A protein has these predicted regions:
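Active-site SXXK
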Residues: 7, 19-47, 79, 208
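Active-site helix/loop module of the DD-peptidase/beta-lactamase fold
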Residues: 40-70, 99-119
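Structured C-terminal helix/loop/strand segments within mature extracytoplasmic catalytic/sensor domains
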Residues: 94-96, 139-170, 181, 185-251
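Conserved catalytic neighborhood of penicillin-recognizing serine enzymes
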Residues: 54-91, 97, 130
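A short, well-structured edge-of-sheet supersecondary motif
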Residues: 1-14, 200
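Mid-domain, small-residue-enriched loop/turn segments at the edges of structured enzyme/sensor domains
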Residues: 89-149
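Acidic helix-start/capping segments at beta-turn-to-alpha-helix junctions
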Residues: 2-4, 43-60, 95-96, 161, ...
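Active-site-proximal beta-strand/loop segments in catalytic clefts of secreted hydrolases
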Residues: 2-4, 51-52, 80-83, 94-95, ...
Length: 251
């Protein structure tokens, strides 16, 4: 957790490697913004769904007919908001995996990597996993927050995408205090369950990443992430949080 006003940081194994799961879509989005800054891609460019880029798992685009065209802007929203795997494949195919890999050091990523095998949605182990760390994910969010990811207009666009409300608030977003706002991305794959977020609060903003792995129960992992979020809610909201928090019934 990093306080974005004071820079004060609380860490627990921040450099441990975890399968990135769908958190990898955040640096993919940043790479796409670099491609646009370099004049090689546009938010208005339209890409077509085909059998080659249709991917199962998360997202609704897999149900769209072949030939359906969507703007890059919309694909990025689907990729983050629905964690849509088809949108992700379409964006990756347009940029090229090699280009995206080259941007990771440019973004400031030393341990986070992306590989073709790592993009697989299968549940078992893969030859080359996409790994990340809590420190690097939090660093990316801080750069976006401060307008330092690619450039200020790109950071503002990405922040708005991350702020879009998900269908059902969960993990770090569950039980968000009134008047707060969250920009976040979740991940869930190969026994990994994550959430990485920026919280906007009346008492100061902060970034927080929780990575969990080797989970036997995704439900328990999600509950743990939510409990950790609530500890920070109490810290930043103080007595106000306890006053509005739902009380448990006594038995």
């Amino acid at each position: 957790l990093r306080d974005l006003r004071t820079g004060k940081t609380w860490m627990h194994h921040p450099d441990d490697l975890f399968p990135a799961a769908s958190l990898i879509k955040v640096p993919i989005m940043i790479a796409a913004c670099y491609k646009m800054k370099d004049g090689q891609l546009s938010l208005d460019e339209r890409l077509a769904i085909s059998r080659r880029n249709r991917v199962g798992g998360s997202g609704s685009l897999k149900w769209r007919p072949d030939g359906t065209k969507l703007a890059v802007r919309d694909l990025l929203v689907y990729m983050i908001n629905e964690s849509d795997n088809t949108a992700t494949k379409m964006i990756l195919d347009r940029m090229g995996l090699g280009y995206v890999q080259q941007q990771f050091p440019r973004i400031g990523l030393l341990y986070t990597g992306i590989y073709e095998e790592g993009m697989s949605i299968k549940g078992g182990r893969v030859a080359h996993e996409n790994y990340t760390t809590a420190r690097e994910m939090t660093m990316l969010l801080e750069k976006i927050y401060k307008g330092e990811a690619v450039d200020k207009p790109s950071s503002e666009f990405m922040l708005e995408v991350l702020k879009r409300p998900k269908a059902v608030p969960s993990r770090l977003a569950k039980g968000l205090p009134a008047g707060w706002e969250i920009a976040h991305k979740t991940g869930l794959l190969r026994q990994a369950c994550h959430d990485s977020a920026i919280f906007f609060t009346p008492n100061g903003d902060y970034a927080m990443t929780v990575l969990t792995g080797q989970n036997q129960s995704y439900s328990q992992a999600k509950t743990l992430i939510t409990k950790l979020a609530h500890v920070t809610f109490a810290n930043y909201a103080g007595p106000r949080y306890y006053a509005q928090a739902p009380r448990r019934r006594r038995r």
